[in-house]
Amino acid sequence: MGIIRTHFEKLWLGEIDPLDVSPFTPLMAWEEVADRVAFVSSFANATAIATDDGLVLIDVGSFLLSAHVHAAVRDFSDSRVSHVVYTHGHVDHVFGVERFEAEAQSRGWRAPHVIAHEAVPARFRRYEISRGYNSCINARQFRTKVEWPAKYRYPDETFADKHTLEVGGLRVELFHARGETDDATWAFVPERRLLCTGDLFIWCSPNAGNPQKVQRFPRDWARALRTMATLRPAVLCPGHGVPIWGEDEVHEALSTTAELLESLHDQTLALMNEGARLVDVIHAVKAPPHLLAKPWLRPVYDQPEFIVRNIWRTYGGWWDGDPSSLEPAPRASVACELAQLSGGPSKLAARATALAESGDLALACHLAELAALAAPNDDGIARSRRAVYAARARAATSLMAKGIYNGEADPV
């Protein structure tokens, strides 16, 4: 048993705590997971499917680690790459085609043919005009400064709903689904009972609520997972994390992930239909504990509260239901009024510190923020504010929350 299969077994059996092992920490290895199928563990994974007429690659890796993916694929097979499938347009999945293209040119092969959903080109164009914003939010989220890419390898062919590849006698079925993105593709290879989910499965609570990024689609996502489960695949190769082996294991992982999304969706929509405000919805909706206890559904990247906000955004407008927020006063003005009523900004800051020490970190952050807005040039208040956010970051489980809180405590 290789390192990747061993890691899966330990995660599945609870011998590794998912809170200690991020699915985004690559094993930097590859392993044959099914007949003539290699899984490459990288920041974003790639899967190489061998046929009698070359390789089909499901994703090619990030702009930072595409060299590793290329080397791993070549360690698996020296065959030419016939097709590349983008599971979606995120930058950790779509870089590295140029390495195989250069190789094809030097060896006299046909260049790889790149296929993606029809919405991928629009995503690339959006990325090209929002480089600054994407650099900022990803630096905050991942706590590292990386220059956002300026150029992209656009697909040669796109499809709308379904597409079938016939390569070297092997059928690779491609399906569109909206989930983490509006341009997602998942792949199924019936002959090898292989499912490649892209980021529709990532070994943690689904990335359906990212606070800094565009609309996600939890309900459609759940439907796609249910469809995948009906195919009874024997191996699941995810966009992040390790593969899942076993028909029953794959079915359970897909079904429970769908169940979590369905529960959050239905609870949120029921409260919206009653006229509830967003803040009340956020605190009322509860993810089923038995689902969050699953090793593949722990909130280590995204978290249920953020998914609830995204569901609100799906059905509602930008207004949160609080009439005072419709045409709000500047927050600094509100902070100054409250500081004056409470005895000054230092009183607010001191109370924030006390609340943080008692464990009420959410309320502590509100007061720390008000104190800093009321006294923006007070170094002592600024330090206490940073300390409150540092404590909030330590208590957070999701990478997204940690990134935002750490960004205030210690900006990158």
Task: Map each language-model feature to its residues.
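N-terminal non-globular leader segments, chiefly Sec-dependent signal peptides
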Residues: 1-16
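C-terminal regulatory/interaction regions
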Residues: 2, 270-412
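Metallo-beta-lactamase
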Residues: 2, 55, 62-64, 120-176, 220-232, ...
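Conserved beta-strand hairpin/beta-sheet module of binuclear metal-dependent hydrolase folds
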Residues: 24-77, 186-198
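Active-site metal-binding motif and surrounding structural segment of the metallo-beta-lactamase
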Residues: 30, 53, 64-114
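Divalent metal-coordination and catalytic microenvironments
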Residues: 36, 49, 59, 73, ...
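Active-site neighborhood of phospho(di)ester-bond hydrolases with catalytic His/Asp-centered motifs
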Residues: 58-60, 80-90, 115-117, 195-198, ...
